[in-house]
Structures are given as C-alpha cells and as structure tokens.
Swiss-Prot record:
Keyword field: Antibiotic, Antimicrobial, Defensin, Disulfide bond, Secreted, Signal
Organism this protein belongs to: Mus musculus (Mouse)
Localization annotation: Secreted
Protein's recorded name: Beta-defensin 25
Biological processes annotated in GO: defense response to bacterium; innate immune response
Taxonomy of the source species: Eukaryota, Metazoa, Chordata, Craniata, Vertebrata
Length: 71
C-alpha cells in the first residue's frame, strides 16, 4: 500500500509543469520581444519596462529618419 501512495505522489509531483518562457513580453507595437539577449537575426531597439532588451527582427527595423541637410 505504501508503494502505491509513493507512486501516486511521485506522479503528481512529476506531472506539475512549471511555467516556461514561451510567451515573451511584446514590444515595439507587437513586432518585438522583450528578452535578456537578442538572437543573431535580431537587433536591440530600446529597453522594455522590466529593463530587458526589446529585440526586433532585422526585417522589421525601421529606417532612420532623413535629415534636411542630407538631401
């Protein structure tokens, strides 16, 4: 009987799934993700409210505004 209780307790403990970081906080109008480090395909744009980096894919990176003197 003790083995069955131990087995049930072990299965209950192992069935608990801790929350993962699959859902990143979004930034830059939903185009970027707040992370500790950006991947090679991403660039850092600004800081998120929790002081992590707002990583934005190079395809979504906005171009720099042109200055009047550059024309």
């Amino acid at each position: 009987m003790a083995k069955w209780i131990l087995l049930i307790v072990a299965l209950l403990v192992l069935s608990h799934v801790p929350p993962g970081s699959t859902e990143f906080k979004r930034c830059w109008n939903g185009q970027g993700a707040c992370r500790t480090f950006c991947t090679r395909q991403e660039t850092f744009m600004h800081l998120c409210p929790d002081a992590s980096l707002c990583c934005l894919s190079y395809s979504f990176k906005p171009s720099r505004p042109s200055r009047v003197g550059d024309v």
